[in-house]
Amino acid sequence: MSDQQQQQPGQDGQPFFNIQRVYLKDLSLEQPNSPHIFLEQEQPSVEVQVDVAASQLAEGVFEVTVIGTVTTKVQEKVAFLVEAKQAGIFDIRNVPAEQMDPLLGIACPTIVYPYLRSNIADTIGRAGFQPIHLAEINFQALYEQRLAAAMEQQGQAGGTGLVMPDGSKATH
């Protein structure tokens, strides 16, 4: 046996990224007009909203949550409303500060989102409706839109820095 201690990942100064867990954090389904809505023959309208949130849980440990809301209406009556939060816990160490926000806003949601899509489609199908398969999302484009909107808002307020979704500050 060797007397050398094994180093934990990320302790050697090298960048380290690990998925600890992906889990369904919250899920709700509302069908306020059932069972009568099943008798409607008109095609439903579908509205989808997706958002991303990130928070630090401990040193080098982050939770990234992808929030999805699907609202389907038939003749202005809500057929169903699904709200879901799919989260992942990520171990991220020795990553330069300027790369953390894109990692939390692009890479992590890209990993978590397929689980959210699956859970939403499954829930809608189990509720008696045709499953809705959410489209793929380009989280880089979404991140860049949020960054541009935040920069514009900051500029209008006369500020000099940018506060990102995780609470950190970035400058332009």
UniProtKB/Swiss-Prot annotation:
For this UniProt record, the keywords arranged alphabetically read as follows: Chaperone, Cytoplasm, Protein transport, Translocation, Transport
State the source organism's domain of life. Answer: Bacteria
| One cellular component term from this protein's GO annotations in UniProt | cytoplasm
Q: Main subcellular localization, coarse class?
A: cytoplasm
Gene Ontology MF terms: unfolded protein binding
Q: Per its UniProt record, what InterPro entries does this chain match?
A: SecB, SecB-like_sf
Its GO biological process annotations read: protein folding; protein tetramerization; protein transport
Gene3D superfamilies according to UniProt: SecB-like
Q: Where in the cell is it found?
A: Cytoplasm
* NCBIfam families, alphabetized: PRK05751.1-5, secB
The cross-references to PANTHER family, in alphabetical order and at most eight, read: PROTEIN-EXPORT PROTEIN SECB (PTHR36918:SF1), PTHR36918
Subunit structure, per the record?
Homotetramer, a dimer of dimers. One homotetramer interacts with 1 SecA dimer.
Q: What does this protein do?
A: One of the proteins required for the normal export of preproteins out of the cell cytoplasm. It is a molecular chaperone that binds to a subset of precursor proteins, maintaining them in a translocation-competent state. It also specifically binds to its receptor SecA.
Family indicated by similarity: Belongs to the SecB family.
Spell out the protein name for this chain. Protein-export protein SecB
Organism, by scientific name, is Ralstonia pickettii (strain 12J)
Species lineage: Bacteria, Pseudomonadati, Pseudomonadota, Betaproteobacteria, Burkholderiales
